[in-house]
Protein backbone atom coordinates (compact mmCIF):
# COMPACT_ATOMS: atom_id res chain seq x y z
CA UNK A 1 0.00 0.00 0.00
CA UNK A 2 1.29 3.48 -0.88
CA UNK A 3 0.12 6.83 0.49
CA UNK A 4 1.73 10.04 -0.77
CA UNK A 5 4.71 8.13 -2.11
CA UNK A 6 5.33 6.25 1.14
CA UNK A 7 4.98 2.54 0.57
CA UNK A 8 4.58 -0.14 3.17
CA UNK A 9 4.28 -3.89 2.93
CA UNK A 10 2.90 -4.05 6.46
CA UNK A 11 -0.60 -5.50 6.58
CA UNK A 12 -2.20 -3.62 9.49
CA UNK A 13 -4.95 -5.50 11.26
CA UNK A 14 -8.05 -3.52 12.17
CA UNK A 15 -8.29 -2.71 15.86
CA UNK A 16 -11.54 -3.97 17.32
CA UNK A 17 -11.34 -1.83 20.44
CA UNK A 18 -13.76 1.06 20.81
CA UNK A 19 -11.52 2.85 23.29
CA UNK A 20 -7.78 2.33 23.26
CA UNK A 21 -5.16 3.21 25.82
CA UNK A 22 -2.27 4.88 24.01
CA UNK A 23 1.07 5.49 25.72
CA UNK A 24 3.04 8.32 24.15
CA UNK A 25 6.61 9.48 24.74
CA UNK A 26 7.34 13.20 24.85
CA UNK A 27 10.79 14.33 23.64
CA UNK A 28 11.22 13.49 19.96
CA UNK A 29 7.65 12.21 19.86
CA UNK A 30 5.34 15.09 20.81
CA UNK A 31 7.96 17.80 20.26
CA UNK A 32 11.48 18.02 18.86
CA UNK A 33 14.36 17.04 21.11
CA UNK A 34 15.35 19.99 23.29
CA UNK A 35 15.48 18.40 26.74
CA UNK A 36 15.24 19.73 29.39
CA UNK A 37 13.26 22.44 27.63
CA UNK A 38 10.10 21.69 25.66
CA UNK A 39 10.99 21.38 21.98
CA UNK A 40 9.09 22.72 18.99
CA UNK A 41 5.71 21.31 18.02
CA UNK A 42 5.76 18.72 15.25
CA UNK A 43 2.05 17.95 14.83
CA UNK A 44 1.49 15.58 17.74
CA UNK A 45 -0.97 17.99 19.34
CA UNK A 46 -3.27 17.70 16.32
CA UNK A 47 -3.34 13.89 16.25
CA UNK A 48 -3.43 13.36 20.03
CA UNK A 49 -6.27 15.88 20.41
CA UNK A 50 -8.25 14.00 17.74
CA UNK A 51 -7.61 10.68 19.50
CA UNK A 52 -8.62 12.11 22.89
CA UNK A 53 -11.76 13.68 21.40
CA UNK A 54 -12.71 10.22 20.10
CA UNK A 55 -12.46 8.89 23.68
CA UNK A 56 -9.07 7.20 23.55
CA UNK A 57 -7.06 7.33 26.78
CA UNK A 58 -3.68 9.04 26.46
CA UNK A 59 -0.87 8.17 28.87
CA UNK A 60 2.29 10.27 28.96
CA UNK A 61 5.10 7.69 29.09
CA UNK A 62 8.38 9.59 29.42
CA UNK A 63 11.78 9.64 31.08
CA UNK A 64 11.08 13.19 32.29
CA UNK A 65 10.67 13.48 36.05
CA UNK A 66 9.72 15.88 38.79
CA UNK A 67 12.63 17.54 40.66
CA UNK A 68 14.74 15.20 42.76
CA UNK A 69 18.29 14.89 43.99
CA UNK A 70 19.25 13.47 40.58
CA UNK A 71 17.70 16.40 38.70
CA UNK A 72 19.43 18.83 41.06
CA UNK A 73 22.72 17.30 39.91
CA UNK A 74 21.62 17.96 36.31
CA UNK A 75 21.17 21.65 37.17
CA UNK A 76 24.83 21.86 38.11
CA UNK A 77 25.75 20.67 34.61
CA UNK A 78 23.52 23.33 33.01
CA UNK A 79 20.53 21.12 32.20
CA UNK A 80 17.53 23.04 33.47
CA UNK A 81 13.97 23.46 32.26
CA UNK A 82 11.87 26.60 32.22
CA UNK A 83 10.11 25.70 35.47
CA UNK A 84 12.80 23.44 36.94
CA UNK A 85 10.26 20.60 36.67
CA UNK A 86 10.78 18.78 33.38
CA UNK A 87 7.82 16.44 33.86
CA UNK A 88 5.45 19.27 34.75
CA UNK A 89 6.56 21.11 31.60
CA UNK A 90 5.43 18.10 29.54
CA UNK A 91 2.14 17.78 31.45
CA UNK A 92 1.51 21.49 30.90
CA UNK A 93 2.08 21.02 27.15
CA UNK A 94 -0.79 18.50 27.02
CA UNK A 95 -3.03 20.86 29.02
CA UNK A 96 -2.18 23.76 26.71
CA UNK A 97 -3.62 21.81 23.75
CA UNK A 98 -6.65 20.45 25.62
CA UNK A 99 -5.40 16.86 25.60
CA UNK A 100 -6.52 15.12 28.79
CA UNK A 101 -4.05 12.65 30.27
CA UNK A 102 -5.39 9.37 31.60
CA UNK A 103 -2.08 8.81 33.37
CA UNK A 104 1.50 9.99 33.66
CA UNK A 105 4.04 7.16 33.60
CA UNK A 106 1.22 5.07 35.05
CA UNK A 107 -1.94 3.31 33.86
CA UNK A 108 -4.37 3.70 36.77
CA UNK A 109 -6.56 0.80 35.64
CA UNK A 110 -3.82 -1.85 35.59
CA UNK A 111 -3.23 -1.88 39.35
CA UNK A 112 -6.23 -4.13 39.89
CA UNK A 113 -4.75 -6.96 37.80
CA UNK A 114 -0.94 -6.62 37.85
CA UNK A 115 1.97 -5.37 39.93
CA UNK A 116 4.17 -4.87 36.87
CA UNK A 117 5.86 -1.45 36.71
CA UNK A 118 5.55 -1.36 32.91
CA UNK A 119 2.72 0.89 31.76
CA UNK A 120 0.10 -1.21 29.97
CA UNK A 121 -1.29 0.26 26.76
CA UNK A 122 -2.87 -1.02 23.56
CA UNK A 123 -0.44 1.10 21.54
CA UNK A 124 2.87 2.88 22.19
CA UNK A 125 4.03 5.87 20.15
CA UNK A 126 7.72 6.62 20.70
CA UNK A 127 10.49 8.01 18.51
CA UNK A 128 12.69 5.13 19.67
CA UNK A 129 10.20 2.45 18.58
CA UNK A 130 11.12 0.20 15.67
CA UNK A 131 9.09 1.13 12.60
CA UNK A 132 7.87 4.53 13.77
CA UNK A 133 8.11 7.06 10.93
CA UNK A 134 10.80 9.63 11.64
CA UNK A 135 11.67 13.04 10.21
CA UNK A 136 15.39 13.74 9.74
CA UNK A 137 15.19 17.06 7.86
CA UNK A 138 15.66 20.52 9.34
CA UNK A 139 17.65 19.13 12.24
CA UNK A 140 19.08 21.95 14.34
CA UNK A 141 19.92 19.92 17.44
CA UNK A 142 23.23 18.19 16.85
CA UNK A 143 24.60 16.85 20.10
CA UNK A 144 27.87 15.69 18.58
CA UNK A 145 29.14 15.25 15.06
CA UNK A 146 27.81 11.70 14.77
CA UNK A 147 24.39 12.01 16.40
CA UNK A 148 21.37 13.79 14.93
CA UNK A 149 18.05 13.42 16.77
CA UNK A 150 15.13 12.78 14.43
CA UNK A 151 11.53 13.17 15.55
CA UNK A 152 8.22 11.42 14.86
CA UNK A 153 6.50 12.13 11.54
CA UNK A 154 2.93 12.69 12.69
CA UNK A 155 1.28 12.87 9.26
CA UNK A 156 2.53 9.34 8.56
CA UNK A 157 1.51 8.22 12.08
CA UNK A 158 -2.02 9.51 11.42
CA UNK A 159 -2.06 7.57 8.13
CA UNK A 160 -0.99 4.43 10.02
CA UNK A 161 -3.76 5.04 12.58
CA UNK A 162 -6.23 5.29 9.69
CA UNK A 163 -4.84 2.12 8.05
CA UNK A 164 -5.24 0.24 11.33
CA UNK A 165 -8.82 1.43 11.84
CA UNK A 166 -8.19 3.72 14.80
CA UNK A 167 -9.02 6.87 12.81
CA UNK A 168 -11.65 7.31 10.10
CA UNK A 169 -10.96 8.75 6.67
CA UNK A 170 -12.62 12.01 7.75
CA UNK A 171 -10.40 12.11 10.86
CA UNK A 172 -7.35 11.68 8.65
CA UNK A 173 -8.42 14.45 6.27
CA UNK A 174 -9.13 16.79 9.23
CA UNK A 175 -5.66 16.09 10.65
CA UNK A 176 -3.89 16.65 7.33
CA UNK A 177 -5.83 19.88 6.74
CA UNK A 178 -4.96 21.19 10.21
CA UNK A 179 -1.34 20.10 9.81
CA UNK A 180 -1.09 22.01 6.52
CA UNK A 181 -2.53 25.14 8.17
CA UNK A 182 -0.07 25.07 11.06
CA UNK A 183 3.08 23.74 9.44
Predicted regions located by residue number:
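HAD-like aspartate-dependent phosphatase fold
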Residues: 2-183
Amino acid sequence: MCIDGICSNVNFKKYKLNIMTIAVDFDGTCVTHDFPKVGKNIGAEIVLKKLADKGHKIILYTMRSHPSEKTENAEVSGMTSTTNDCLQDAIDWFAKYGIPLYGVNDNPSQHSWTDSPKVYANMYIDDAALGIPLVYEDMKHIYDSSMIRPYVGWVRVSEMLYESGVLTYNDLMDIIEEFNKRY
